[in-house]
Amino acid sequence: MLLKCRDFQRKYFRKLRKKINNKIREQLAISISKKIFYCNILDSVKNIAIFCSFDGEIDTYPLILKLWRQNYNVYLPIINYNYKKILGFMKYLPNTSLIKNRFNILEPVFDRKNFIQSDDLDIMFVPLVAFDEFGYRLGMGGGFYDRILINYDIKKSFFPIGLAFDCQFSKNINIKYWDVALPVIITPKKFWIWI
């Protein structure tokens, strides 16, 4: 079947998530945000990484607003601070200026005093294009999150949580040796838990 090719899977699921109309997309983003706060998954954590939504991903802004209101330290990934394809994280405040990186994704301008490595995070919300019944995710193809998730797999220094629409579930993601399964993926309708 054609859906076994990772590039085809990416195109298919990116197109699928982009088809969700804006009104429903907004409701689903609020639903996920409420679900995260309702389940107490954020108890005893301080530093939370999240992503700026891009290319039809679930809108993280309602969650970011709630995190700020609850006084969590919110961090966004940054890839322009070096060229090693490793993500770092910058503190994100309501007045933080964002610029588009080379992939057209919004990120903060590098500032050493607001920069942390993934080891200093408690939770990392992870974007994905698709996911399967075992927690494996298909990303956009750059490998940035794959390299960070290896740190989770080895050190368990932060807890990664995938955020997705329900339509991004796939029964047949083509897994590669570098892929790391997420322990939790949250969709508007379901908590997928593998821990």
Curated annotation (Swiss-Prot):
Membrane-spanning segments: none
Protein name, per record: Uncharacterized protein bbp_370
Family membership: Belongs to the 5-formyltetrahydrofolate cyclo-ligase family.
Domain of life: Bacteria
GO molecular function terms listed in the Swiss-Prot or TrEMBL record: 5-formyltetrahydrofolate cyclo-ligase activity; ATP binding
Signal peptide: none
Residues at which ATP binds: 6-10, 139-146, 179
Top-level taxonomy: Bacteria, Pseudomonadati, Pseudomonadota, Gammaproteobacteria, Enterobacterales
UniProt-listed InterPro entries: FTHF_cligase, FTHF_cligase-like_sf, NagB/RpiA_transferase-like
Xref: Gene3D superfamilies: NagB/RpiA/CoA transferase-like (3.40.50.10420)
